[in-house]
Amino acid sequence: MKKAEMGRFNISPDEDSSSYSSNSDFNYSYPTKQAALKSHYADVDPENQNFLLESNLGKKKYETDFHPGTTSFGMSVFNLSNAIVGSGILGLSYAMANTGIALFIILLTFVSIFSLYSVHLLLKTANEGGSLLYEQLGHKAFGMVGKLTASGSITMQNIGAMSSYLFIVKYELPLVIQALMNIEDTNGLWYLNGDYLVLLVSLVLILPLSLLRNLGYLGYTSGLSLLCMMFFLIVVIFKKFQISCPAEIAFLVNETVNSSLTQPATFLPDMGFNRTESDSCQPRYFIFNSQTVYAVPILTFSFVCHPAILPIYEELKGRSRRRMMNVSKISFFAMFLMYLLAALFGYLTFYGHVESELLHTYSSVMETDILLLIVRLAVLVAVTLTVPVVIFPIRSSITHLLCASKEFSWWRHSVITVSILVFTNLLVIFVPNIRDIFGFIGASAAAMLIFILPSAFYIKLVKKEPMKSVQKIGAMFFLLSGIVVMTGSMALIVLDWVHNAPGGGH
């Protein structure tokens, strides 16, 4: 360990003065679910730039001198916004339809504030613990168990994100092909079957890109994804004023939805909207039903960006914890508004008949709309190019765990890549609904990354604050809240699965 490495923090003494332990992992930089952050060392073998576990740069004789951040404040805000926004935005209208407007806003506010608070804990823990690597903080706090827990949570979150992207391909690509080919009768056409199309896209497009040894241009897909989601938001708002609320929406959703969804609307009778035709298009503010349990996991899934916080912090020009918190506040507030508007206008368009993937709901009432077709194409391109970015850190983590001391092997590289893709494709084919991905990952990995791990690391590693201090008591309360959220949400989701299993309720 070298003392010079700690100089790279460049923390203002008046702000973060504390005794740091040394750390050899500050050269770390990796892509999140949306972004591939630029590495300091472009010449490092990509497979050895460990994205999920501690870097083994001892073998590479690099300088560990003071390294100031080079990314501007505005670009850091953009990078963090890229890391936050993801496919979860497509499920927010469904969450609002099962909570009501007022309850959704309350939950969204609390989840965003809690997520921001966990960023505060994570940054302070990084300074005290002397590491800018999430998993290394786990190792410093709880040894190998902490390291594996952090690594496993991030890997689960990445697999969930990748699955949600492929679900979008499964849902939307058949509709795009149908619209482009002007096909009326879809019965028996294999190229309109979502399962076949996911396999085809994975084999022809995603696999070759995923086999690359470095990310290259794929790193720019983060910006493309954010732009696509902003375009999606604009279209959602515009369509609210173009689509009147037809009384027959429920019929349309159940009868005309494309076969790429596995029983897509069978959960509608259980949604708790017992209304007449006259009030079917009236907004509701508080709703409690069997699907309300998915709201918090969907929201937590949508706000996970914590593995990207430390790399962005490392790159920040004029690096200080206060400056990074300002970056986080602006990014979280921007995404809060974006999520709220997308959920609100999507809900006010379809009310209680929103599907778990909002974009697919439009196919029930506007099958041939050109603007929606453009949105679908943009989203499909973005998510298809993002999947290899997400595979990269998962593969690096597995390689490090299983073959850390071995030289690079194309055979091993290919087998791990194919295995990840096969596993994810099986999830997408056999898990009936994207809501289940949002719910399960949001209740497990996302809850770990937002609530449990940052607070646990803070309690363990920040030594200068006594356990009876307000800060430690707050962190302890946050930890307990995370455990309650995770166990409660998981239990209710499993109960919902069991309850609906006989009738195929998903």
UniProtKB/Swiss-Prot annotation:
Region (Disordered): 1-23
UniProt topology in membrane: Multi-pass membrane protein
GO cellular component: cytoplasm; plasma membrane
Catalytic activity: L-alanine(in) + Na(+)(in) = L-alanine(out) + Na(+)(out); glycine(in) + Na(+)(in) = glycine(out) + Na(+)(out); L-serine(in) + Na(+)(in) = L-serine(out) + Na(+)(out); L-proline(in) + Na(+)(in) = L-proline(out) + Na(+)(out)
Regulates protein turnover upon amino acid deprivation: annotated span: 1-96
Binding-site residues for Na(+), renumbered to this chain: 82, 386
UniProt modified residues of type Phosphoserine: 12, 21-22, 55
Single GO biological process annotation from the record: L-proline import across plasma membrane
A Pfam family recorded for this sequence: Aa_trans
PTM comment, free text: Polyubiquitination by NEDD4L regulates the degradation and the activity of SLC38A2.
Membrane-traversing stretches: 77-96, 103-123, 159-177, 189-209, 218-238, 293-313, 330-350, 372-392, 414-434, 437-457, 473-495
Record-linked InterPro entries: AA_transpt_TM (IPR013057)
Extracellular-side positions: 97-102, 178-188, 239-292, 351-371, 435-436, 496-506
Membrane topology, Cytoplasmic segments: 1-76, 124-158, 210-217, 314-329, 393-413, 458-472
Glycan attachment residues as annotated in the record: 258, 274
A GO MF label: proline:sodium symporter activity
Disulphide bonds in the chain: 245-281
Main location: membrane
Subcellular location: Cell membrane
Described function: Symporter that cotransports neutral amino acids and sodium ions from the extracellular to the intracellular side of the cell membrane. The transport is pH-sensitive, Li(+)-intolerant, electrogenic, driven by the Na(+) electrochemical gradient and cotransports of neutral amino acids and sodium ions with a stoichiometry of 1:1. May function in the transport of amino acids at the blood-brain barrier. May function in the transport of amino acids in the supply of maternal nutrients to the fetus through the placenta.
Similarity comment text for this entry: Belongs to the amino acid/polyamine transporter 2 family.
Name recorded for this polypeptide: Sodium-coupled neutral amino acid symporter 2
Organism the protein comes from: Bos taurus
Designated gene of the protein: SLC38A2
